[in-house]
């Protein structure tokens, strides 16, 4: 049993490295170019369907992971959007639309964030929406591109 005196939550957050305030200059804002490294997993089919990180068994296929996906983030105050400019999501699904589920996280994370999320079909890419498939994303890094 822990008999140490109780500490305030602020102490725990500082020790655990949890960021409670998002620095303004570390936020992803309107018109930022964002590079992303991720793994997409089709929950229904239990299959990894798209990725741009090194995965076991794919070390000898650098075309899959050499470059990140890149998109422009647009926030007009009432809605947000993302437009892929390059990468594997555009190549696989043939659309420049960033899955809306990805964009929801950007208001709450900082540069270099690692996010794991389940995106329901209605918040996913066109294929997810059409076939009513939820996807799990392990987004290893959201990173503002250097201007």
Where are the regions that the model predicts?
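Short, solvent-exposed beta-strand/turn "edge" segments of beta-rich domains on protein surfaces
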Residues: 19-32
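A beta-strand/beta-hairpin structural motif
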Residues: 43-141, 145-146
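Single conserved hydrophobic/aromatic residue that forms the stacking wall/gate
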Residues: 2-13
């Amino acid at each position: 049993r822990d008999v140490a005196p109780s500490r305030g939550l602020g102490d725990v957050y500082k020790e655990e490295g949890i960021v409670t305030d998002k620095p303004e200059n570390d936020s992803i804002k309107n018109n930022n170019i964002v590079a992303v490294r991720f793994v997409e997993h089709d929950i229904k089919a239990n299959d990894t369907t798209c990725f741009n990180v090194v995965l076991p068994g794919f070390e000898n296929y650098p075309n899959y992971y050499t470059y990140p996906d890149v998109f422009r983030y647009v926030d007009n105050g009432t809605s947000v959007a993302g437009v892929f400019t390059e990468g594997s999501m555009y190549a696989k699904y043939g659309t420049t639309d960033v899955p809306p589920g990805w964009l929801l996280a950007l208001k709450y994370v900082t540069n270099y964030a690692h996010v794991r999320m389940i995106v329901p079909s209605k918040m996913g890419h066109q294929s997810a929406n059409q076939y009513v498939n939820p996807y799990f994303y392990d987004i290893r890094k959201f990173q503002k591109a250097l201007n």
